[in-house]
Amino acid sequence: MLTIVYVLILLVLILMLFTGIGGWIGAGRLLRITDVWYVVTLRLSGATEETVTLPRQVETAYDGIFGIAWQHDYAILGKIVASDTQTVTRRIIKTTQPLSAGLLVTWNIFVYQGDPQRTLGLAYDDVRIPSELGPLPAWLVPGERTTWVLLVHGFHAPREEGLRILPTLAQMGFPVLQLSYRNDAGAPRSPDHLYHLGDTEWRDVESGVRYALAHGAQDVVLYGWSMGGCMVETFLRRSSYTAQIRAVILDAPLLDWHKAIDTQMHKLHFPHWFTYVVEWAAALRAGINFAALNHERPARERTTPTLLFHGTADGMVPIGSSDTFAQAQPDLITYQRMNGVDHAQAWNADPQAYEDAVKTFLTRETSDKPVSHGEKSST
């Protein structure tokens, strides 16, 4: 009998050991710095002067505006004009070089590749934002207004994520600061060389706000995609500059890391409890406070007008978090719930509707009335 007990104890210890190792590896994949997270590579099936045919897969089957890139060139593709079980044919809106069958390309949900001048013909300055870790590279597109817009890209996404909405913001006269943050390419590394999932990165958003205020901004609109949305919401809870935030725009914001990680664990056929193991390992490795990064239910003192986009087909960040978030403050949050749209692709699905929503919201919230929300002031 005693032998059986010892065997059971040994089996439990072995199970705990392997579970801990698995959680440590999972946390490492989540926190490890990499310039490329997920790249979809395609070989073109065919092309004409007006259309391009691609292999049919989940990414290429979504209707809307998308991009492809190869070497130093790119093309912007329009809506689907034909499809079958094997291929999808799209209209070519723009291409920097002729396309041909067999060309190896990467799929680009951000549509544009390059800086604002090269891709959109918008003049900009390369600036460096002082931060606690060193200078952060940023693009500054000038404008005549005293309200600046600060764009915060998502997890493993490039600054180009914000280029889709940049022409709209520039047309409205806003100075736009496209920020990079710690561990981005060209930006300083965090001391432990790990991502902190917004728990420390929000301070780089604060550095961007401080820079804007020091260079003529009277107030700021924060605009975040995915983890950038988590960083914006963390800023609103922790920063001493919240009184200077005029409004917020969130696109597929990551408001609850537990649910986002659990979604990916489910896809990989791991049990629900393994999500907690990964979080435990991530907290141990990087000191992340996951409870403090849960923004699904806004703090009572949160009084910032917000425009929220989220797609019902989001496979990365569950839309339920945005549903709960919007329901908590219906008087402050204007919710654009996009049917059948994947992660951070609301603009791609319907650019005109997306841009109209942004224009309407910013026109309403950035008139010449003073900022009246928020109880904190800058120090």
What residues fall within each predicted segment?
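Short, surface-exposed "cap/lid" segments of acyl-processing enzymes
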Residues: 135, 141-182
